[in-house]
Amino acid sequence: MTIILGIDPGSRVTGYGLIKESDRKIAYIDSGCIRTSNDTELSHKLLQIYDGICELMDHYSPTEVAIEQIFMHNNPNSALKLGHARGVAMVAAASHRAKIFEYSAREIKQSVVGYGAAEKDQVSHMVVELLQLNRAPQKDAADALAIAICHSHMRNGLSKLIGSRGTKRRRMRL
């Protein structure tokens, strides 16, 4: 059995989703959001994200972590803040000796929905279907679960079934 933590990083809201994989079957464990205080400095927000991810790592002990890659924003300042949030999430996971994998938004959508340009509501719907949930999780948590599902598919060779047109296996980061 493998426990996978999916992370959808953000400086205000970082989504997380935990699934377990056993015999190529996935099951929901937990999901939610780490919300940072609006009135604090960036350094304090980053510490809140770091502490939140560390708490998840301590409680659930995932051995693999999947995180969304940065995409270019129109606003460079937003991209920098997202990069900082992503960085502290990765450091928190790495400090717990988890293997870290990165996927682009297109790869995640392709893996979960079957279409790399899928809309957010399509991704959320497939998360509910694949994990047999009663209702859709919060937006950022649903995205994080999609990232975890994508990693499960990739580690089980979905990329070979889709072919080079769809997605490619990502390098592991330690």
UniProtKB/Swiss-Prot annotation:
Listed cofactors: Mg(2+)
Which Gene3D superfamilies does the entry mention? Ribonuclease H-like superfamily/Ribonuclease H
Q: Where is it chiefly localized? A: cytoplasm
Q: Where is Mg(2+) 1 annotated to bind?
A: D8, D140
Q: Which family does it belong to?
A: Belongs to the RuvC family.
Please tell me where Mg(2+) 2 binds in this chain. Answer: E68
Stated EC number for the protein is 3.1.21.10
On assembly, the entry states: Homodimer which binds Holliday junction (HJ) DNA. The HJ becomes 2-fold symmetrical on binding to RuvC with unstacked arms; it has a different conformation from HJ DNA in complex with RuvA. In the full resolvosome a probable DNA-RuvA(4)-RuvB(12)-RuvC(2) complex forms which resolves the HJ.
Q: Which reaction does it catalyse?
A: Endonucleolytic cleavage at a junction such as a reciprocal single-stranded crossover between two homologous DNA duplexes (Holliday junction)
List this protein's GO terms for biological process.
DNA recombination; DNA repair
Q: Which HAMAP family match?
A: RuvC
Q: What does this protein do?
A: The RuvA-RuvB-RuvC complex processes Holliday junction (HJ) DNA during genetic recombination and DNA repair. Endonuclease that resolves HJ intermediates. Cleaves cruciform DNA by making single-stranded nicks across the HJ at symmetrical positions within the homologous arms, yielding a 5'-phosphate and a 3'-hydroxyl group; requires a central core of homology in the junction. The consensus cleavage sequence is 5'-(A/T)TT(C/G)-3'. Cleavage occurs on the 3'-side of the TT dinucleotide at the point of strand exchange.
Q: Where is the active site?
A: D8, E68, D140
Subcellular location, in the record's words? Cytoplasm
Q: Which domain of life is it from?
A: Bacteria
A Pfam family that this protein carries is RuvC
Cellular component terms, GO, for this chain's entry?
cytoplasm; Holliday junction resolvase complex
Write the record's keywords in alphabetical order, separated by commas: Cytoplasm, DNA damage, DNA recombination, DNA repair, DNA-binding, Endonuclease, Hydrolase, Magnesium, Metal-binding, Nuclease
Q: What name does the UniProt record give this protein? A: Crossover junction endodeoxyribonuclease RuvC
Primary enzyme class: hydrolase
Enumerate the GO terms in the molecular function aspect.
crossover junction DNA endonuclease activity; DNA binding; magnesium ion binding
